[in-house]
Amino acid sequence: RVEEVTVCDAATVARGRAWRTPVLYKVAVPGRHFAINAMGVLAVTHALGLDRALAVTALGQWQAGAGRGLREVIVLDKVEPHLTLDLIDDAYNANPASLGAALEVLAGARPKDGLGRVSHGRRIAYLGDMKELGREEQALHRALATRPGMERIDIVHCVGPLMRELWRSLPERQRGHWCEDSASMAARVAHDLDAGDVVLVKGSLSMGLGRVVDAIRKMGHGPATV
């Protein structure tokens, strides 16, 4: 079981117990949920009789894939390569638990001040509808406004009719744009983002938030770095 998790800027370190002994491991991406999933990997390793030390080493090099929490540094100016923003591409799916975990990661991120025209870095979220939640879908979207860590996010942009429930529930200071579809939101990103920002993009796959991710990548000069 996982007993302690420390989320750092570029990694997550966890302590727990497995096979009746203490275990210490890390994953090369921030996120409490990644550490919990990693303990499951170690349990499978043990069940299959594989090398635990080798598994721990591999976890220390593991990074999230595209659409599932991949972090990229987008260089915004080829003349001044220090002008960057950080992108968290989590656009493949969304439900209340996974979105809450992603918001926790964003809330703990460190924007960079003094880089762009806004002068201070911001935590910005682009959130699309969470699908297939049944009768409580509107209430579950509204409830995101009071999730732990939400108060640390500077601007929340919302996509889709269900996320409009969240948009209406947010304080005025956090309320960004609301758009019916991802294409409309993607057309705005170049005007809304600046150097120093940390940006999360997340929504159910059918909402097409990958368009927003692509629009952010197109702001870059040269290949993005992970």
Predicted regions and their residues:
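A generic structural motif
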Residues: R15-R17
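Short amphipathic beta-strand and strand-loop transition segments with alternating hydrophobic
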Residues: E3-T6, R71
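Short, surface-exposed loop motifs enriched in S/T, G, D/E and P with embedded aromatic residues
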Residues: V2, Y25
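ATP-dependent carboxylate-amine ligase
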Residues: A10, R20, K26-H33, M39-V226
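A short, compositionally biased
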Residues: V7-V13
